């Protein structure tokens, strides 16, 4: 028994990401769209441990341990009428009557607060059915109203009720040039401020970076959210694969935290995935372990727009899947460390955590190869790296926040929902000190008296 993981999907981004993630899980476990074992599946018998993600019902159906919540009814209605309507427990699809209107304060204080108790009750129901709960994966965006405001509210409550359990976030972060709402910088700064203390590890994804990966590597001229989400789902799946399948080096949720977060506030790793290649091109490529590992460190394979060559790595987790042996991974890491462009901080000499899982990576089949589906490959690697370069992303966000806040633009919408204006400046100060934390970590720690602690 490896422990269960509960998925919580909040807001439109969380819901759509969740849809792609569960689509992939069903494929990996050999289950049909309504959660029964698929007789035609190639993974029959090797479906791994179902218990981690699914509860088995009395009639042999596997029901996901997941909760979908949105204050706006339409994204949840899409699931209720979509291809997976038979899969999810209807009580665990919760939608409100009015949406958060891209307003953090609505999601956190007014509309969201009314739904909070109901949502926490449902979470309690799911966790009561678990033998040994490992933790939570929370999917949401920092830019929307529900994702930021309600997401922060749910994480605050989880931190109270499940203090010892692991809480990992997958957050869609506002992209540098593409914005879906004018007030994204406000929502993101407020949400980051209120979740900093409550989340153990937050994996950031920005849509622009993933768009570029899809355009460049999969030759999709205009990628849709579905293309983006399927790519992100591959990383989500790798993170939990060793809880579900056997491998040479297993990694559980707590290990991410232990190995990736040197200081509690600095918990925003970058993620990247290789190989991202279309089915039409895959015949011309070799996917050696060492090549895939190097691909992960290319700036244009990373899911947040920032340049890791400008920063230093504090810790890196490499999660391999498929036909990979430990000797190859050690050689790949040694080759990496020898490169001059790879900078580790001085105070963390090893810096690498490796996971190996024997389950081959799978991808959701598309109607035609031209649709930009991922090629089926024998091995893949997901990289989670805590690097000081991600401070670039924070400073971009803070700059946008400052431009609007200097004129107090749009602030009345937040104050009108019962939020105090002081919370804006408090949140902004918190992010300024987060940027400072990254600067200090990147600097040498030689001036700190390390012996004083012992």
UniProtKB/Swiss-Prot annotation:
SMART domains: Tubulin, Tubulin_C
Gene it is expressed from: tba-1
Function summary: Tubulin is the major constituent of microtubules, a cylinder consisting of laterally associated linear protofilaments composed of alpha- and beta-tubulin heterodimers. Microtubules grow by the addition of GTP-tubulin dimers to the microtubule end, where a stabilizing cap forms. Below the cap, tubulin dimers are in GDP-bound state, owing to GTPase activity of alpha-tubulin.
This protein's record includes keyword Nuclease: no
Name recorded for this polypeptide: Tubulin alpha-A chain
Family label: Belongs to the tubulin family.
EC number(s) stated in the UniProt entry for this protein: 3.6.5.-
Annotated site, Involved in polymerization, chain positions: 453
BP GO annotations: microtubule cytoskeleton organization; mitotic cell cycle; nuclear division; nuclear migration by microtubule mediated pushing forces
Subunit composition and interactions: Dimer of alpha and beta chains. A typical microtubule is a hollow water-filled tube with an outer diameter of 25 nm and an inner diameter of 15 nM. Alpha-beta heterodimers associate head-to-tail to form protofilaments running lengthwise along the microtubule wall with the beta-tubulin subunit facing the microtubule plus end conferring a structural polarity. Microtubules usually have 13 protofilaments but different protofilament numbers can be found in some organisms and specialized cells.
């Amino acid at each position: 028994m490896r422990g269960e993981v509960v998925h919580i999907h909040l807001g439109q981004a969380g819901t759509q990401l969740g849809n792609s993630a569960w689509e992939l899980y069903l494929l990996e476990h050999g289950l049909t769209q309504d959660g029964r074992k698929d007789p035609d599946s190639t993974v029959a018998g090797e479906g791994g441990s179902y218990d981690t993600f699914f509860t088995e019902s009395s009639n042999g159906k596997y029901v996901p341990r997941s909760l979908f919540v949105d204050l706006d009814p339409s994204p949840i209605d899409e699931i209720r009428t979509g291809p997976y309507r038979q899969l999810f427990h209807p009580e665990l699809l919760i939608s409100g009557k009015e949406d958060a209107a891209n307003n953090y304060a609505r999601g956190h204080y007014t509309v969201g607060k009314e739904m909070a108790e109901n949502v926490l009750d449902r979470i309690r129901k799911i966790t009561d059915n678990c033998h040994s709960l490992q933790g939570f994966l929370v999917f949401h965006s920092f830019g929307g109203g529900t994702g930021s405001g309600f997401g922060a509210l749910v994480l605050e409550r989880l931190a109270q009720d499940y203090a010892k359990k692991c809480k990992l976030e997958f957050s869609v972060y506002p992209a540098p040039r593409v914005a879906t709402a004018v007030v994204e910088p406000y929502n993101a700064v407020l949400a980051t401020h209120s979740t900093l203390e409550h989340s153990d590890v937050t994996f950031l994804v920005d849509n622009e970076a993933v768009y570029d990966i899809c355009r460049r590597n999969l030759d999709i001229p205009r990628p849709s959210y579905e293309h983006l989400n399927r790519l992100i789902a591959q990383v989500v799946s790798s993170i939990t694969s060793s809880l579900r399948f056997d491998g040479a080096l297993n990694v559980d949720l707590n290990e991410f935290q232990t190995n990736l977060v040197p200081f509690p506030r600095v918990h925003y790793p970058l993620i990247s995935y290789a190989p991202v290649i279309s089915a039409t091109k895959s015949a011309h490529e070799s996917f050696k372990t060492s090549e895939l590992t190097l691909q992960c460190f290319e700036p244009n394979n990373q899911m947040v727009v920032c340049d890791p060559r400008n920063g230093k790595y504090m810790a890196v987790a490499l999660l391999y899947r498929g036909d990979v042996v430990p000797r190859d991974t050690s050689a790949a890491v040694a080759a990496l460390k020898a490169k001059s462009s790879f900078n580790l901080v001085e105070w963390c000499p090893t810096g690498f955590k490796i996971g190996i899982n024997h389950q081959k990576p799978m991808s959701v089949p598309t109607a035609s190869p031209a649709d930009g589906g991922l090629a089926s490959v024998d091995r893949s690697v997901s990289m989670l790296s805590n690097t000081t370069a991600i401070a670039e992303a924070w400073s971009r966000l803070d700059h946008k926040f400052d431009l609007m806040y200097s004129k107090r633009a749009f602030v009345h919408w937040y104050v009108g929902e019962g939020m105090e204006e002081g919370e804006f400046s408090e949140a902004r100060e918190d992010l300024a000190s987060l940027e400072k934390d990254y600067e200090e970590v990147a600097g040498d720690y030689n001036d700190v008296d390390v012996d004083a602690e012992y």
